Amino acid sequence: MESSSTIDPAEVAKFEAMAAEWWNPHGKFKPLHQMNPCRLDYITQQIAAEFDRDLSAPLPFEGLRLLDIGCGGGLLSEPMARLGAEVIGADAAPRNIPVAKLHAEQSGLAIDYRNTTAEALAAAGERFDVVLNMEVVEHVADPLAYLTACRELLKPGGLMICSTLNRNPKSFAMAIVGAEWVMRWLPKGTHDWSKFITPDELYDLIRKAGLDPVDRKGMVFNPVSWSWSLSARDLSVNYVTASVRRT
């Protein structure tokens, strides 16, 4: 894999150590499995709106080239492929790729998984209609350089979906103390709270990278129903944004 200034080796090592767990809904990635329907709801609605696609069609995203950066085991890549997109999944952790490839093959899906980085793909001239950048930006060494590479990966008119975690006392209490220390949904140290990014900070970085932010929503966990939902107002912990490359 090509080296990149935004890759944080310590962050990559954390996820490499958990590679075999990706498709276990009760394992170390249980929070992502629980959040996935909410993430997919936002992603599909934003893509459909931006590219004028009918989600009731058999393959609504047919003809769209989509990159899933930090794809892990393919929790988002596979649903996007089922909707008809040409999917490339990229991950900096080498052990994630064979896990993702095997599961896609077992599911009868043609997904191009690669052990590479956003910067390497951009340098190679790869371009996409959609870039998924989900729960990655809080793990990179240089968020602005990383988002700039994401911008280079988009065709003019292309769409980037980016999700991350807010940085405030509530997010520390829920994402660090609650999820890692008390509930043990994730191994301790999975997240570094100091790397969390506020919504306004992310919007500023996105603009500096040359993209136009067009939407953002909170992703809110309900401990009673044990489910996630989108919120236009509550961006206090998890949130997701949509941005467009205009030129």
Swiss-Prot record:
One of the GO biological process terms: methylation
UniProt EC number: 2.1.1.222, 2.1.1.64
Signal peptide (UniProt feature, chain positions): none
Job description of the protein: O-methyltransferase that catalyzes the 2 O-methylation steps in the ubiquinone biosynthetic pathway.
InterPro entries in the cross-refs: SAM-dependent_MTases_sf, UbiG_MeTrfase
Source organism of the structure: Cereibacter sphaeroides (strain KD131 / KCTC 12085) (Rhodobacter sphaeroides)
Gene name tied to this protein: ubiG
Protein name, entry field: Ubiquinone biosynthesis O-methyltransferase
Annotated family: Belongs to the methyltransferase superfamily. UbiG/COQ3 family.
Keywords tagged on the record: Methyltransferase, S-adenosyl-L-methionine, Transferase, Ubiquinone biosynthesis
Molecular functions (GO terms): 2-polyprenyl-6-hydroxyphenol methylase activity; 3-demethylubiquinol 3-O-methyltransferase activity; polyprenyldihydroxybenzoate methyltransferase activity
Pathway membership: Cofactor biosynthesis; ubiquinone biosynthesis
Domain of life (superkingdom): Bacteria
Reaction(s) the record says it catalyses: a 3-demethylubiquinol + S-adenosyl-L-methionine = a ubiquinol + S-adenosyl-L-homocysteine + H(+); a 3-(all-trans-polyprenyl)benzene-1,2-diol + S-adenosyl-L-methionine = a 2-methoxy-6-(all-trans-polyprenyl)phenol + S-adenosyl-L-homocysteine + H(+)
